[in-house]
Amino acid sequence: MNTNRGRYPPGVGTGRGAPPNPDYHQSYRQQQPPQDQQYVQRGYSQNPQQMQLQQQHQQQQQQQQWSRRPQLPGNASNANEVVQQTTQPEASSDANGQDWKATLRLPPPDTRYQTADVTATKGNEFEDYFLKRDLLKGIYEKGFEKPSPIQEESIPIALTGSDILARAKNGTGKTGAFCIPVLEKIDPNNNVIQAMILVPTRELALQTSQVCKELSKYLNIQVMVTTGGTSLRDDIMRLHQPVHLLVGTPGRILDLTKKGVCVLKDCAMLVMDEADKLLSAEFQPSLEELIQFLPQNRQFLMFSATFPVTVKAFKDRHLRKPYVINLMDQLTLMGVTQYYAFVEERQKVHCLNTLFSKLQINQSIIFCNSVNRVELLAKKITELGYSCFYIHAKMVQDHRNRVFHEFRNGACRNLVCTDLFTRGIDIQAVNVVINFDFPRTSESYLHRVGRSGRFGHLGLAVNLVTYEDRFKMYQTEQELGTEIKPIPSNIDQAIYCQ
């Protein structure tokens, strides 16, 4: 906000100037004659000529007083214009909207190529949704420049209070599509849980809560994340402090709710990220029980890349006239090029070594179908001389958290994991995904390859396919409507490194 604006003289008028200046009044009083002398003069001064001279003297003093005011930029044509500009400085600065934007600490612009998955927008700006100024500041400083297609469709509808069932590709901005309206609707002066975001994995909960904290850093909104595998006592202590937004996995939140420490009677918004996974047999019983603690006038926001039959049944049971958004005319990301290499099982490690030597890898994620194979492969890759982390569901939670954050921060180039890491994990530097073991389902394949090519950028997916995997690969192509091409001897870096 521009602070170099014109003001009334200190202590004069009722405008937006500084509070009354006692020094000014003191000097002003010193210029006046004593009170008794003033009465003597009034009683004595009956001459009209003397009265006229006294009035002129008072007018001169007033003009001198106004001349001491700080001058505004530009030449005002008359005093009325000056007063109008003085009393309404913020309105003019808000009108052009430049002052507050000039103070933003923006991250370096991302100059990488982006596909139509995120650029095929209607041309809207975040300001078109009349969001809070402090939320807009957080959005821009997070690096969000304009709404992506899923954000354009979701944000205005969510702000009206309608239920939403949204389907969009991995890595196209779904997290921002629900975090922004949730943060906009939260009242920071009401210290109750007003919104809840449910996710299927602990890593995704940590990532989502971090996004919420970064977007709301200028708002006084308290975000709490809670997942299994962490201290229940710490969560109970935290819930005795103000919490406005709760992010976590269904099982842990249900546990805290049953204990009476997590009170959801004022939680009017429920977000389900990766909704298809939350409605699987693993999570649905906890989810259904958790919903019973919510108020009747709750709002549901459901987001995912795939919606099986279980989602439709849940929608019919709980959602009220939901607004359905489907941006999945093509299931796989436009920017991800997919190849396969026919290999024997015993040749896979050698083939992987060849890929490492030929590909320009920023960061890669390598998927296996079992915990044992993850650990064995990570050991082999380390023996080949490449830096490598691994992560799977049987690891201690603190170790999982450390691996996740260090890989995200670029401490290591390669990560070997199970399907634990396929849901929603957003690491912009990952440009190569390798399916060391071909996934068992087309749904798993879709989420795996979606770890590269995030937010419209380019990526590469390479599948090591054995004789037994041929039918699964063909079935995946048919179900997803995509083509997996044979790998060429030389891969053009332009298709995954721009």
Swiss-Prot record:
Swiss-Prot/TrEMBL keywords: ATP-binding, Cytoplasm, Helicase, Hydrolase, mRNA processing, mRNA transport, Nucleotide-binding, Phosphoprotein, RNA-binding, Translation regulation, Transport
Residue span of region Disordered: 1-114
Residues given in the record as ATP binding sites: 168-175
Major enzyme class: hydrolase
InterPro entries the UniProt entry points to: DEAD/DEAH_box_helicase_dom, Helicase_ATP-bd, Helicase_C-like, P-loop_NTPase, RNA-helicase_DEAD-box_CS, RNA_helicase_DEAD_Q_motif
GO cellular component, one term: cytoplasmic ribonucleoprotein granule
An example molecular function term from Gene Ontology annotations: mRNA binding
Listed Polar residues bias regions: 74-96
Record-listed E.C. numbers: 3.6.4.13
Residue interval(s) of motif Q motif: 124-152
SMART domains in the record: DEXDc, HELICc
Modified residues (Phosphothreonine): 230
Pfam families xref list: DEAD (PF00270), Helicase_C (PF00271)
SUPFAM superfamilies cross-referenced by the UniProt entry: beta-sandwich domain of Sec23/24, P-loop containing nucleoside triphosphate hydrolases
Compositional bias annotation for Low complexity: 27-65
Compartments it resides in: Cytoplasm, P-body
GO terms of biological process kind: mRNA processing; mRNA transport; regulation of translation
Helicase ATP-binding domain boundaries: 155-325
Organism superkingdom: Eukaryota
Catalytic reactions of this protein: ATP + H2O = ADP + phosphate + H(+)
Domain (Helicase C-terminal): residue spans on this chain: 335-495
Motif residue range(s): DEAD box: 273-276
Free-text note on domains in this protein's UniProt record: The Q motif is unique to and characteristic of the DEAD box family of RNA helicases and controls ATP binding and hydrolysis.
Family: Belongs to the DEAD box helicase family. DDX6/DHH1 subfamily.
Described purpose of this protein according to its UniProt entry: ATP-dependent RNA helicase involved in mRNA turnover, and more specifically in mRNA decapping.
Identification of the protein by name: DEAD-box ATP-dependent RNA helicase 12
Gene name as annotated: RH12
